């Protein structure tokens, strides 16, 4: 794994398919950060950026809390949608990527 100030690169992934946007209207990580994901299929890497965290996200939007080792990501035909306060979610064909 390579680490920089605001970016983490992961290359070892396990793919679990058959998830849809209905399963996760947006992503929220337990702890202090909202994460933005970008998938580079040609490089086979997952790019993660830390975004500001707000405690009221889960209450206001009924967000999904996920284990820090498990991330949801759309990998094909993905549209990244932003909302106020840097809330981000993914539309499109989505898969679950689990770090191993």
From Swiss-Prot:
Kindly provide the name given to this protein in its UniProt entry.
Answer: Putative uncharacterized protein C8E11.08c
Q: What is the source species?
A: Schizosaccharomyces pombe (strain 972 / ATCC 24843)
């Amino acid at each position: 794994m390579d680490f920089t100030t605001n970016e983490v690169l992961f290359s070892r992934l396990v793919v679990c398919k058959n998830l849809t946007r209905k399963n996760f209207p947006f992503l929220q990580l337990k702890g202090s950060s909202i994460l933005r994901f970008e998938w580079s299929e040609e490089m086979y890497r997952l790019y993660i950026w830390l975004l500001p965290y707000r405690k009221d996200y889960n209450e206001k939007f009924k967000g999904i809390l996920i284990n820090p080792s498990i991330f949801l990501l759309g990998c094909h035909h993905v549209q990244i949608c932003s909302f106020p306060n840097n809330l981000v979610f993914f539309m499109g064909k989505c898969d679950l990527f689990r770090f191993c």
